[in-house]
């Protein structure tokens, strides 16, 4: 199955809110943003650099009520404060957010939010199945989810660019 540009966990949250939602996923090399109105994606954007300036532009075009931010680059208080001040409901995805899966990873506070997002999203899209989720981005991650919804963990390896550089391509 080919995954969406925006991680499926964020779709889980988008589909469980009504009205217009702002969905932000900050990865290692880019930030992906989607605008959802109920269950329909109205727009999506990819940014190399994403900050409050980009948010102000988006808020000028859309009337957001809810939002979620998933990031692997660490908490940005300026960005978070801006979103908290503008949105009726804002979720910063971290290990304290109640999820529809059971995380059996030994140290959930060290688990990359991209990996957690992939596990929740896959389970949401394919409930009741044993799943191996592979995400090929800056890194390649492998996540194992049981049919019961238990996330067992996974593995992370260098992405394709790093692999080719290592082989002098």
Predicted regions span which residues?
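General beta-strand structural signal in soluble alpha/beta enzymes
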Residues: 91-95, 111-113, 132-135
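Methionine residue identity
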Residues: 1-3
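Gly/Thr-rich phosphate-binding beta-strand-loop-beta motif of the actin/hexokinase/Hsp70
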Residues: 19-37, 122, 128-147, 151, ...
């Amino acid at each position: 199955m080919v995954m969406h540009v925006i991680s499926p966990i964020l779709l889980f949250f988008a589909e469980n809110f009504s009205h217009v939602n702002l969905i932000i996923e900050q990865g290692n090399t880019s930030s992906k943003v989607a605008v959802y109105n109920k269950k329909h994606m109205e727009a999506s954007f990819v940014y190399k650099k994403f900050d409050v300036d980009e948010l102000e532009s988006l808020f000028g075009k859309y009337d957001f009520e809810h939002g979620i931010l998933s990031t692997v680059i660490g908490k940005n208080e300026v960005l978070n404060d801006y979103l908290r001040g503008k949105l009726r409901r804002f979720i910063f995805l971290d290990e304290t957010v109640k999820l529809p899966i059971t995380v059996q990873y030994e140290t959930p506070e060290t688990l990359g939010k991209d990996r957690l997002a992939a596990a929740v999203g896959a389970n949401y899209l394919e409930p009741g199945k044993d799943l191996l989720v592979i995400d090929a981005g800056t890194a390649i991650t492998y996540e194992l989810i049981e049919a019961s919804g238990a996330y067992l963990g996974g593995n992370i390896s260098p992405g394709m660019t790093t692999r080719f550089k290592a082989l002098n391509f």
